[in-house]
Amino acid sequence: MKMANPKYKRILIKLSGEALAGERGVGIDIQTVQTIAKEIQEVHSLGIEIALVIGGGNLWRGEPAAEAGMDRVQADYTGMLGTVMNALVMADSLQQVGVDTRVQTAIAMQQVAEPYVRGRALRHLEKGRIVIFGAGIGSPYFSTDTTAALRAAEIEADAILMAKNGVDGVYNADPKKDKTAVKFEELTHRDVINKGLRIMDSTASTLSMDNDIDLVVFNMNQSGNIKRVVFGENIGTTVSNNIEEKE
C-alpha cells in the first residue's frame, strides 16, 4: 500500500534510558536496543531525518544520589556520562542495520564522539545521517527532557516524539491506578503547563511551547508506532500550540 506524505519530516526521538534496559529495568539489554534500532531504521529508510536524545536512568539517577548525600553537581555529571554510554550503544546498533550515525556530546570526549556543533549536526541530518545527542546540555540541573526540547529547537525539528514504555499517551490520572482515567488525544502546551501534566519537566515544556514544536507521546513497545506517528496516525497524545484548548 502506498504511504501518504509524512506529517513530520525531521523528528527528534526522546527515549528513556530504561527503554534500553528491556524487562530488567536496569543496565543495557543489547537485543532490546537492536529492536529499537530496527524500528528507527525503518522510518529513516523513508527519508525522515532523525535525531535522538536518550536518558540515562537505566545506569544512574542523579537526584536520588544527591538525596543520599552526593554533591548534586557531581551526581548530574555522572548521569551525563551514562547518557553517552547509551548513545554509543544505540549508535552501534544503528550502524549494524545500515544507518550512518553520529554521536555528538555536550561535554568534549573526542576519542569517542564529536563535540556538539549545531551546524555540523544539521549537515549530518541533511546528508541522511542519524545524530544522537549525549551528555545532556553539558550543565547540571537540566534534564534530558530539556536537552530534547533544546536540541529540537536548535535543529528546527518538526516534532519531538516522546517514546514511552507501555504508556500510550497522556491521561488525567495514572491509568495503572485509576480505571476511570481518561486519555487526552490532543492538548496545547499551555494545557500541559496549567494542568500540571508531567509529560516533561516545566523547563522543557516551556521551551517546546515557545519554539512551537509539536510533542507526541506514544507507546514505543508496539512495533511500527514510530512510523505511525510520523505519518500522522492519532495513536497517542499530540501536544501543540495549534490545537484548541480542552476544558
UniProtKB/Swiss-Prot annotation:
Q: Where in the cell is it found?
A: Cytoplasm
Entry's EC annotation: 2.7.4.22
Recorded GO CC terms: cytoplasm
For this protein, the record's Pfam families field holds: AA_kinase (PF00696)
Positions with a binding annotation for ATP: 14-17, 57, 61, 165, 171, 174
Q: Describe its function.
A: Catalyzes the reversible phosphorylation of UMP to UDP.
The protein here is known as Uridylate kinase
Q: Which organism is it from?
A: Streptococcus pneumoniae (strain ATCC BAA-255 / R6)
Gene giving rise to this polypeptide: pyrH
